[in-house]
Curated annotation (Swiss-Prot):
A Pfam entry, by short name: TGT
Protein name: Queuine tRNA-ribosyltransferase
Keywords: Glycosyltransferase, Queuosine biosynthesis, Transferase, tRNA processing
Region listing for RNA binding, in residue ranges: 249-255, 273-277
Function: Catalyzes the base-exchange of a guanine (G) residue with the queuine precursor 7-aminomethyl-7-deazaguanine (PreQ1) at position 34 (anticodon wobble position) in tRNAs with GU(N) anticodons (tRNA-Asp, -Asn, -His and -Tyr). Catalysis occurs through a double-displacement mechanism. The nucleophile active site attacks the C1' of nucleotide 34 to detach the guanine base from the RNA, forming a covalent enzyme-RNA intermediate. The proton acceptor active site deprotonates the incoming PreQ1, allowing a nucleophilic attack on the C1' of the ribose to form the product.
Gene name tied to this protein: tgt
Molecular function in Gene Ontology: tRNA-guanosine(34) queuine transglycosylase activity
Organism listed in the record: Brucella melitensis biotype 1 (strain ATCC 23456 / CCUG 17765 / NCTC 10094 / 16M)
Catalytic activity: 7-aminomethyl-7-carbaguanine + guanosine(34) in tRNA = 7-aminomethyl-7-carbaguanosine(34) in tRNA + guanine
Residues bound to substrate: D94, S95, G96, G97, F98, D148, Q191, G218
Entry GO CC: cytosol
Quaternary organization: Homodimer. Within each dimer, one monomer is responsible for RNA recognition and catalysis, while the other monomer binds to the replacement base PreQ1.
InterPro entries xref list: ArchSynthase1/Queuine_TRR (IPR050076), TGT (IPR004803), TGT-like_sf (IPR036511), tRNA_ribo_trans-like (IPR002616)
Pathway terms, separated by semicolons: tRNA modification; tRNA-queuosine biosynthesis
Family the UniProt entry places it in: Belongs to the queuine tRNA-ribosyltransferase family.
Length: 377
């Protein structure tokens, strides 16, 4: 049930995996949760009603993109991001920091914040911890992120430590700027690259700030999966058990299964939507590339057992035709399929944890991927 305050409850455990609920005034988020990415106020190639019907309880908006276009103040005048974009449930916004570090031009970073030029028109902006929280407040998101500095991996240890310590100081400033908002939350972001002692230092310091939730950032940025999982094994035991844990920017279905097993509750990634726009489908059989000629005369659907019309009601031959022809409907149908599969996976994960059968579910799911797609006709 919805509540006036922000709250998190663990309902079941299976090893380190947790099944629970995040309660907010705008709705309940069932965890483990996958958040479709609505970068600029839209989950690309999807209607918001479709996203909801697939089982998503929460979506993500991107502070950097929204502050540049249409502008946070304009969104506020139009009633906030929920009203503006037609999504009535909870919304999480990132701080904009990752995009500033990776997309923006001519960055200048110091203790106060970061100045940069828009990748769209070259206009100069300044992002500080206080301004990031102000923008997220104008967007009226339900869960907000601290501003942090995310370094690309591999990174020299000295630079990684400097960025981590700066992010901790920025977390303190974000906490002050956020203040007391009972129905909302600000999450701190654990940084430290691929260095265990830095991750420990970051997690311990953020834990001491007694925030409402905790994110793990700076992973899934090109490092091997084993490194990401090693860092989760360092961080998750430190973070409070009664607070939600969010792994930012992750990831593949396999990443999700292995991260849930280490105690992560929330995920987001552009992968299912981006892959759909490039002809790639996620299914119970693993990844299926609809560009391949083997599908050109295949009358079978992607997955006859799926509840999603895109997966069940359209032939592989038709999807292949749409993708090869560059038709917009191809991107729409494959994005629909992919988000349906991700939510199907999360639903299965939650049920398996509740039943104490998460390891069995993981084994069955990975065996399905390993068997591969149905044989070609």
């Amino acid at each position: 049930m919805t509540t006036e305050n922000f709250g998190f409850k663990v309902l079941a455990r299976d090893g380190a995996a947790r099944q629970g609920e995040i309660s907010m005034p705008r709705g309940v988020v069932r965890t483990p949760a996958f958040m479709p990415v609505g970068t600029a106020g839209t989950v690309k190639a999807m209607y918001m009603d479709q996203v909801k019907e697939l089982g998503a309880d929460i979506i993500l908006g991107n502070t950097y993109h929204l502050m540049l276009r249409p502008g946070a103040e304009r969104v506020a005048r139009l009633g906030g991001l929920h009203e503006f974009g037609g999504w009535k449930g909870p919304i999480l916004t990132d701080s904009g920091g990752f995009q500033v570090m990776s997309l923006a031009q001519l960055r200048k970073l110091n203790e106060h914040g970061v100045t940069f030029r828009s990748h769209i028109d070259g206009k100069a902006y300044e992002m500080t911890p206080e301004r990031s929280i102000e923008i997220q407040g104008l967007l009226d998101s339900d869960i907000q992120m601290q501003l942090d500095e995310c370094v690309a991996l591999p990174s020299p240890e000295k630079n990684t430590e400097r960025a981590m310590e700066l992010s901790l100081r920025w977390a303190e400033r974000c906490k002050v700027a956020f203040g007391d908002q009972p129905g909302k939350a600000m999450f701190g972001i654990v940084q430290g690259g691929d260095i265990a002692r830095l991750r420990e230092r970051s997690a311990e310091a953020l834990k001491a700030m007694d925030l409402k939730g905790y994110s793990v950032g700076g992973l899934a940025v090109g490092e091997p999966q084993e490194v990401m999982l090693d860092m989760l094994e360092v961080v998750c035991p430190i973070l409070p058990t009664e607070k939600p844990r969010y792994l930012m920017g992750v990831g593949t279905p396999d990443d999700i299964l292995k991260s849930v097993a280490r105690g992560i509750d929330m995920f987001d990634c552009v992968m299912p939507t981006r892959a759909g726009r490039h002809g790639l489908a996620f299914t119970r059989f693993g990844k299926v590339n609809l560009r391949n000629a083997r599908h050109a005369e295949d009358h079978r659907p992607l997955d006859p057992q799926s509840d999603c019309p895109a997966s069940r009601d359209y032939s592989r031959a038709y999807l292949h035709h749409l993708v090869k022809s560059g038709e917009a409907l191809g991107a729409m149908l494959l994005t629909w399929n992919n988000l349906a599969y991700y939510q199907y996976l999360m639903k299965g994960i939650r049920a398996a944890i509740a039943d104490g059968k998460f390891s069995d579910f993981t084994a069955e799911t990975t065996e399905g991927w390993a068997r591969g797609d149905m044989p070609a006709l």
